[in-house]
Amino acid sequence: MDPEEQLESTEGVPAKSLSLIKHILLVLSGKGGVGKSSVTTQTALTLCGMGYNVGVLDIDLTGPSLPRMFGIEDSSIYQSADGWMPIPVETNGKGKLCVVSLGFLLGSRGTSVVWRGPKKTSMIRQFIKDVTWGELDYLLIDTPPGTSDEHISIAEELRFTNPDGAIVVTTPQGVATADVKKEINFCRKVNLRILGVIENMSGFVCPYCTECTNIFSKGGGESLAKQFDVPYLGNIPIDPKFVDLIENQKKMEGTLVELYEKSSLYPIYLEIMKKVQEESSKPQE
């Protein structure tokens, strides 16, 4: 169904509560191309591997990539009597994992979304109020880069739900950290707690000897965290094997969660999630 038709057809549906969701985490970046959606995907897979029930909401309306990341791009969302039903990801007995994205409502991957602010706001409001998530331990919200209509809308929609906070993603280069500063300032303006900064693409893991080489500069994310007095969650290298996993997951034996648990990045994300849980457990100031 065309997403604009979907907006019209669900108008007037009663809002759904997020009260059954224990923790809400937003994943933000000031700059495009820093691997934010990759971080969201791996965070979800890690939490699921830890046994948690996880939902992922993709509000990058003009560039929804999560359906492909999870290997469910051919799925379609349908509306039940209770609201929109998230698309499940097979976990084979691990925690529950499900995804909602505008990508499921588009006719094809090449369909462009050319919407002004009010229509984006309406779509995000529907995602927040009309999706039947059920009981979840975590809801991850993947946002577009920058501080645009989507960010303002999600901040407004979540203002009464008391989200745990935001994970801010950057790469080591100065051009990325400069834009992330704006994202941190945005979080502070809307009273969204920053759980920490992740430095993504911090080095390259050789697929043959597993040695990690710094192909970019290093330490930009940690310096940024110190500058703004926010937690530094860790650095994540580029691993070609993870790219291969995402691209060829349907040809491999096992679920995406099981395959990811064998990757070199899984232990790194386990440590990062422990830090996130520690930060989110602290009382908000």
Swiss-Prot record:
Record-listed [4Fe-4S] cluster binding positions: C206, C209
Cofactor: [4Fe-4S] cluster
GO molecular function ontology, one term from the record: metal ion binding
Alphabetical list of InterPro entries matching this protein: Mrp-like_CS, Mrp/NBP35_ATP-bd, NUBP2/Cfd1_eukaryotes, P-loop_NTPase, YlxH/NBP35
UniProt-listed GO biological process terms: iron-sulfur cluster assembly
Gene3D superfamilies: P-loop containing nucleotide triphosphate hydrolases
Location of this chain's protein in the cell: Cytoplasm
Predominant cellular place of this UniProt entry's protein: cytoplasm
Residues where ATP binds: G30, K31, G32, G33, V34, G35, K36, S37
Family membership: Belongs to the Mrp/NBP35 ATP-binding proteins family. NUBP2/CFD1 subfamily.
PANTHER family: CYTOSOLIC FE-S CLUSTER ASSEMBLY FACTOR NUBP2, NUCLEOTIDE-BINDING PROTEIN NBP35 YEAST -RELATED
Complex and partners: Heterotetramer of 2 NBP35 and 2 CFD1 chains.
Function: Component of the cytosolic iron-sulfur (Fe/S) protein assembly (CIA) machinery. Required for maturation of extramitochondrial Fe-S proteins. The NBP35-CFD1 heterotetramer forms a Fe-S scaffold complex, mediating the de novo assembly of an Fe-S cluster and its transfer to target apoproteins. Required for biogenesis and export of both ribosomal subunits, which may reflect a role in assembly of the Fe/S clusters in RLI1, a protein which performs rRNA processing and ribosome export.
Name this polypeptide is given: Cytosolic Fe-S cluster assembly factor CFD1
